[in-house]
Amino acid sequence: MASLDNLVARYQRCFNDQSLKNSTIELEIRFQQINFLLFKTVYEALVAQEIPSTISHSIRCIKKVHHENHCREKILPSENLYFKKQPLMFFKFSEPASLGCKVSLAIEQPIRKFILDSSVLVRLKNRTTFRVSELWKIELTIVKQLMGSEVSAKLTAFKTLLFDTPEQQTTKNMMSLINPDDEYLYEIEIEYTGKPESLTAADIIKIKNTVLTLISPNHLMLTAYHQAIEFIASHILSSEILLARIKSGKWGLKRLLPQVKSMTKADYMKFYPPVGYYITDKADGIRGIAVIQDTQIYVVADQLYSLGTTGIEPLKPTILDGEFMPEKKEFYGFDVIMYEGNLLTQQGFETRIESLSKGIKVLQAFNIKAEMKPFISLTSADPNVLLKNFESIFKKKTRPYSIDGIILVEPGNSYLNTNTFKWKPTWDNTLDFLVRKCPESLNVPEYAPKKGFSLHLLFVGISGELFKKLALNWCPGYTKLFPVTQRNQNYFPVQFQPSDFPLAFLYYHPDTSSFSDIDGKVLEMRCLKREINHVSWEIVKIREDRQQDLKTGGYFGNDFKTAELTWLNYMDPFSFEELAKGPSGMYFAGAKTGIYRAQTALISFIKQEIIQKISHQSWVIDLGIGKGQDLGRYLDAGVRHLVGIDKDQTALAELVYRKFSHATTRQHKHATNIYVLHQDLAEPAKEISEKVHQIYGFPKEGASSIVSNLFIHYLMKNTQQVENLAVLCHKLLQPGGMVWFTTMLGERVLELLHENRIELNEVWEARENEVVKFAIKRLFKEDILQETGQEIGVLLPFSNGDFYNEYLVNTAFLIKIFKHHGFSLVQKQSFKDWIPEFQNFSKSLYKILTEADKTWTSLFGFICLRKN
């Protein structure tokens, strides 16, 4: 790639080159990242300036001959021209705000007529040329490309669409005559038409900025903004690959900085009590980096904010991380990257915080409104002390800003690897959506109109890769709202469709709202109420600061993952009191120890083998799915739609986290669309069935399979519960559908207790190296297995030494009830039968399988039933 000055010099020399005297020499400026919205913005801006313009139609056929582009072009209604186009040099502007701007020097040389063949590329071009001056003309071209069989099949139709519109084409009506859904390309080019010797690099930069300013009046500010981000990145990143992403604009400030994670109960349980952590308040501001660079003082946030200068003498750089209040130009620092030229990113937070206060004082010395956030180091695990610490931060009324949450910072890690968590009250959790008015006449039942309201659809942004891995589909009406060129990009809008509320993207906007015209805008919204298949949304504000971002075609509100993880705070509310006392309802929170490795691997192997039996099925329901321990197995099996049901909201929230973890870190051949339903399975089958059938897209005939791993003992309290379970399975399954249960076998447990003469309230134990590994406490006195209601206490690998009560499963009674409700027994098998297969699967793990492991495993079994 040449420098811009060298390219201009080469251009000027071309006119003195005798070998090029019959050639057309072209110097063009091209913008390579143009979508319909950007194209339309520039077009309408030029029309509004009443610049002289002409419209032309042409068909260019391009044939590759010895790596050269041989062209036949017909500018209607003229004759065909034959020429070859040869590039000589190019220069590409590196700043992201230039939209891939490239200066190209090329020559066109006349050639003989040639014959077209099936390899030809056909480009139909509808071009409007704006003569902005004697030196420059700006060409805006709508292009349709056809190749191979498309040429004969579609050429005539697209000639009509592009050239022979019902209404005569003018610059004022052109944008209304072209349908952006017809898979067009959009090109903006600037061609130099002045005297070659008069051209300078500065002229090129000036006209380039003229066009970019039409797209964004703040283009020059955006360029400075990206340069500031590059400066910050140069002190944070060491990888040239990552720095290149910053320079290209693929990464912005948000991707560069370590992100604060919305904290769930499951997150907190992993490090509760948070001894050693630092806490501070969450201000209702925006993330910003305060920088002293040479003589300039500025903040990089959603844009570049200049705060002043240091005077004539340049200072060594200082870079602080914090929250910024744009209206008051106030900065509140919570971390430091560099202080007076000393890079601090590899130090732990407990060390960096010492330099943070010094950096704040430097800003204050230049009359900048800056302050260090108040931090408390947590030193006690006592819940009462923790409560006082959290209250002193969250309920402090003397702060100069409103507080909407608490930040917890982990010590001991580098700047980029510091884990920072954010807790907010449910009410203060909001999401940013791109809002579009729902197209009319879609005839979609879920889009039913409501009197006094207008239906709008809520969208967020998603990468093409994540869209595929989550097996998402576009909602009805999507293609009417977004042109195909936007849909074909690597990052595009998608309806907000969280796993527990697939129709959360529906928003009924009141006709009486003070927010009148919201179509096409980014709104900050909060959830007021969650009902079956309906969410009541409230508008907090219009994000006016995001409207320019929309024009780039790369921003559509929150990212899908960020939006759904934030949404979890509505699904599983995390109270302020739980910060001190620890999260409530954390069933099976403990971790397994190493002594369970082989036995756990055996159980996992068996569940994997069972789930593989339902591979590639369309709809599968998991009863008691918990936090998704089997999610990876369903993904490996290629299940297309998975409905997970559980009454534990915290577990379901963890499942959603796992959904994204699998999508970003594991490779699966097939994608699975995951739905979760917060539901107590002991409630009436009719009510549960109705909720499942209301899941968007769930088939009327029912699911292919129902799976329940190690859960049904919760539903063996009485006969009514077992009957209810059988009825539920019958209502949810299609004819011929299968039920797959894994469970502890009640008859085998009773046999074990009898063999070891375990009486009421006594405990059977299996020890390993004097450590109790497995244990069952007898909580019933009957000598024979009852149909239901017999309790035992079980010591589980992850229960931290506590016994969990459950009911014995009388499998004969269970099968009897299911047969009564229209099922047939397909298979019943003990887990011990899988041990030989496990030996073949992993000889190394089998070798460390102990007798206690084998005894414990033999207590479990598998039951398969088919709906008649």
UniProtKB/Swiss-Prot annotation:
Pathway: mRNA processing; mRNA capping. It comes from African swine fever virus (isolate Warthog/Namibia/Wart80/1980) (ASFV). Keywords: Early protein, GTP-binding, Hydrolase, Methyltransferase, mRNA capping, mRNA processing, Nucleotide-binding, Nucleotidyltransferase, RNA-binding, S-adenosyl-L-methionine, Transferase, Virion. Part of the viral DNA-directed RNA polymerase that consists of 8 polII-like subunits (RPB1, RPB2, RPB3, RPB5, RPB6, RPB7, RPB9, RPB10), a capping enzyme and a termination factor. The N-terminus contains the mRNA 5'-triphosphatase domain, the central part contains the mRNA guanylyltransferase, and C-terminus contains the methyltransferase domain. It comes from the Viruses. Probably catalyzes the second reaction in the mRNA cap formation pathway. Forms a covalent complex with GTP. The keyword GTP-binding applies. GO terms for molecular function: GTP binding; mRNA 5'-cap (guanine-N7-)-methyltransferase activity; mRNA 5'-triphosphate monophosphatase activity; mRNA guanylyltransferase activity; polynucleotide 5'-phosphatase activity; RNA binding. Its EC number is 3.6.1.74, 2.7.7.50, 2.1.1.56. S-adenosyl-L-methionine binds at K607, G624, D646, L710, F711, I712. It catalyses: a 5'-end triphospho-ribonucleoside in mRNA + H2O = a 5'-end diphospho-ribonucleoside in mRNA + phosphate + H(+); a 5'-end diphospho-ribonucleoside in mRNA + GTP + H(+) = a 5'-end (5'-triphosphoguanosine)-ribonucleoside in mRNA + diphosphate; a 5'-end (5'-triphosphoguanosine)-ribonucleoside in mRNA + S-adenosyl-L-methionine = a 5'-end (N(7)-methyl 5'-triphosphoguanosine)-ribonucleoside in mRNA + S-adenosyl-L-homocysteine. The keyword Nucleotidyltransferase applies. Residues 594-868 form the mRNA cap 0 methyltransferase domain. Pfam families: mRNA_G-N7_MeTrfase. This is mRNA-capping enzyme. GO terms for cellular component: virion component. The record marks K627, R658, H713, E806 as: mRNA cap binding. The lineage of its organism: Viruses, Varidnaviria, Bamfordvirae, Nucleocytoviricota, Pokkesviricetes. CDD domains: AdoMet_MTases.
